[in-house]
Amino acid sequence: MKEKIVLAYSGGLDTSVAVQWLIDKGYDVVACCLDVGEGKDLDIVYKKALDMGAVECHIIDATKEFSDEYVSYAIKGNLMYENAYPLVSALSRPLIAKKLVEIAEKTNSVGIAHGCTGKGNDQVRFEVAIKALNPSLKAFAPVREWAWSREEEIDYAIKHNIPVSINHDSPYSIDQNLWGRANECGILEDPYAAPPEDAFDLTNALEETPDTADEIILTFDKGIPVQIDGKTYELDDLILTLNALAGKHGIGRIDHVENRLVGIKSREIYEAPAAEVILKAHKALETITLTKDVAHFKPIIEKQFAEQLYNGLWFSPLTDSLKLFIDSTQQYVSGDVRIKLFKGNAIVNGRKSPYTLYDEKLATYTKEDAFNQDAAVGFIDIYGLPTQVNAMLHGGYSNEQ
């Protein structure tokens, strides 16, 4: 009886070729495809996996779990790797790994295979997650093992009659989910080459965007967006709605050269319309609901959290602790944020909260001012005392300094 291998199957080039490759190695292939909001026709994927020779194919709708358990932390934590990348692909990997392990245990498979290359981040993310969840499972990386170029892989697919929606003229590698879309390879590998319009799918070019702005009110409850203009949504539906609306205005295009975990720099094209709008709105709401010390310290945690996720360490004690901290900061991050969507920009022009720490009577310069300006003299004396003592001992700073 042949041993079984669970394959993370997308229906794309790498995993379609991997099915045949694993069969040639003597394994029965159990294909597993997760829907995390990419809008893929899963019936086609299911049929294709079986046509490729898989003995089973499991289709799992994990969109809601993805939004509620993973994207929610990206929002509450304002997660951006290198202040540019909203972790589109990285965010889905721990969930995919979790489901693959569940299928492997259910089918008595000896290991899990993925379609990642040997120079990408995802191989690390999947394999480290698998080790954390079930150390007894083996990891298989066909693409890494055969070490073909993109062109060689396409030629192999054509030779073996493997249908793939890719050719030498359009050799993009695309990954998409609820939170956005990632694109690499082809002309995009030249960091000076302007991305052609066919590299984008979720967003309009600025020249094609409406000449009239849309203004929306995004309502948050404990850090999570729950309404658009007073209409309540589940988080996954809200994100899909915003993707369409913000994408229409060309919002969410990201052209980024990032530092990969494996040590190389990689040029990536991302589209994340909803992510850009939600994160800007969330940050705006935090400016009036977080205390100064929390507002200043939280970005340090956010940076570490983003790096943990990018580096494949979702299932780790540190990440568990970071999640607890992030959750603790969101108790009062509730309220409304008004955002103008226009010509590639998401512009926050208003925010309010029942828990606002902004006191207009303290901030105003009108006669309604409630701030005790007389208290400033004593405050400055105490605050400036260390500076004064240092100057008295060592001499004051000269104009030249």
Curated annotation (Swiss-Prot):
Chief location: cytoplasm
Reaction catalyzed: L-citrulline + L-aspartate + ATP = 2-(N(omega)-L-arginino)succinate + AMP + diphosphate + H(+)
PROSITE patterns reported in the protein's UniProt record: ARGININOSUCCIN_SYN_1, ARGININOSUCCIN_SYN_2
EC number: 6.3.4.5
Keyword Cytoplasm (UniProt): yes
Record's keyword terms, sorted: Amino-acid biosynthesis, Arginine biosynthesis, ATP-binding, Cytoplasm, Ligase, Nucleotide-binding
GO cellular component annotations of the record: cytoplasm
Top-level taxon: Bacteria
Residues the entry annotates as binding L-aspartate: T117, N121, D122
Binding site for L-citrulline: Y85, N121, R125, S173, E258, Y270
CDD domains hit by this protein: ASS
Pathway in which this enzyme or protein is active: Amino-acid biosynthesis; L-arginine biosynthesis; L-arginine from L-ornithine and carbamoyl phosphate: step 2/3
MF (Gene Ontology): argininosuccinate synthase activity; ATP binding
Pfam families given in the database record: Arginosuc_syn_C, Arginosuc_synth
Subcellular location: Cytoplasm
A biological-process GO annotation: L-arginine biosynthetic process
Keyword ATP-binding belongs to the record: yes
Residues bound to ATP: A8, Y9, S10, G11, G12, L13, D14, T15, S16, G115
NCBIfam families (UniProt xref): argG, PRK00509.1
Quaternary organization: Homotetramer.
Family designation: Belongs to the argininosuccinate synthase family. Type 1 subfamily.
HAMAP family hit by this protein: Arg_succ_synth_type1
Protein name: Argininosuccinate synthase
Organism annotation: Staphylococcus aureus (strain NCTC 8325 / PS 47)
Gene, per the UniProt record: argG
